[in-house]
């Protein structure tokens, strides 16, 4: 029997990617789509390449009081837009919030699926991690768990594609402004900082108050590369070994000897991690790559929904990355 799925915020990049993944999922059936900017349109008008079986599904105006019978709801709304509305969704509907309103909120489980999968299976309210936390915490988790680095010395330098700014865009995100340009933003106050700090402290049992995180927009469509520096006396071999043990049996995290590239993960739910360390300099470098719309958003959301529904976590996510 199919699992009835709805997507709120389908007009945006995250919601659109969720639609693409749900459309190809062996157990999910998309029966409801809502989007403020596209209400009244057929799905094929908004996404001309949508599968024929979904072409005539009409996008509705988001109203939690008028939901059809659903098993799972994906919410991909701007920060501040989902907290009150999702509270009115019936308790028996499983929700994965791709937006930022419920990360570490009471009553919600933080869905970093490759680190804490056992906590997700029995829950009905999952807060998907942000794209930068997904890219940074995945390589950091093994080092923190094995006490190979000091959690209060972490510096994260991250680069993301323009789709990370969302479909709404705005000044600074147009082609003429972003092409051949590198744009730092959110210095010292990025919205993902508290989420990263709290997760580092949770994994390590120590303080992350010294965290430095600087994101940059780069002129590519999708992908995140996080280059992370921390103090520690570990060797490169010890870091790689810790990651291989931590992610043994993982369907999505790949530990690689050479530095990963954003193209490796494009269009997929994969995460690539690698390390370089110099114990004489008390320095560890960790590298993490994800697709910001995949593992950083809709891919991880589907992975979380699979776990919530008792399905194989790889269901609907087994496609290879797009190359080149």
UniProtKB/Swiss-Prot annotation:
The keyword Cell inner membrane does not apply. It catalyses: N-acetyl-L-glutamate 5-semialdehyde + phosphate + NADP(+) = N-acetyl-L-glutamyl 5-phosphate + NADPH + H(+). Its EC number is 1.2.1.38. GO terms for molecular function: N-acetyl-gamma-glutamyl-phosphate reductase activity; NAD binding; NADP+ binding. CDD domains: AGPR_1_actinobacAGPR_like, AGPR_1_C. Keywords: Amino-acid biosynthesis, Arginine biosynthesis, Cytoplasm, NADP, Oxidoreductase. It comes from the Bacteria. Signal peptide: none annotated. One of its GO terms (cellular component) is cytoplasm. It is found in: Cytoplasm. Pathway: Amino-acid biosynthesis; L-arginine biosynthesis; N(2)-acetyl-L-ornithine from L-glutamate: step 3/4. Pfam families: Semialdhyde_dh, Semialdhyde_dhC_1. The active site is at 131. One of its GO terms (biological process) is L-arginine biosynthetic process. It is an enzyme of class 1 (oxidoreductase). The keyword Amino-acid biosynthesis applies. PANTHER family: N-ACETYL-GAMMA-GLUTAMYL-PHOSPHATE REDUCTASE, CHLOROPLASTIC-RELATED, N-ACETYL-GAMMA-GLUTAMYL-PHOSPHATE REDUCTASE, CHLOROPLASTIC-RELATED-RELATED. Belongs to the NAGSA dehydrogenase family. Type 1 subfamily. Catalyzes the NADPH-dependent reduction of N-acetyl-5-glutamyl phosphate to yield N-acetyl-L-glutamate 5-semialdehyde. This is N-acetyl-gamma-glutamyl-phosphate reductase. It comes from Bradyrhizobium sp. (strain BTAi1 / ATCC BAA-1182). The lineage of its organism: Bacteria, Pseudomonadati, Pseudomonadota, Alphaproteobacteria, Hyphomicrobiales.
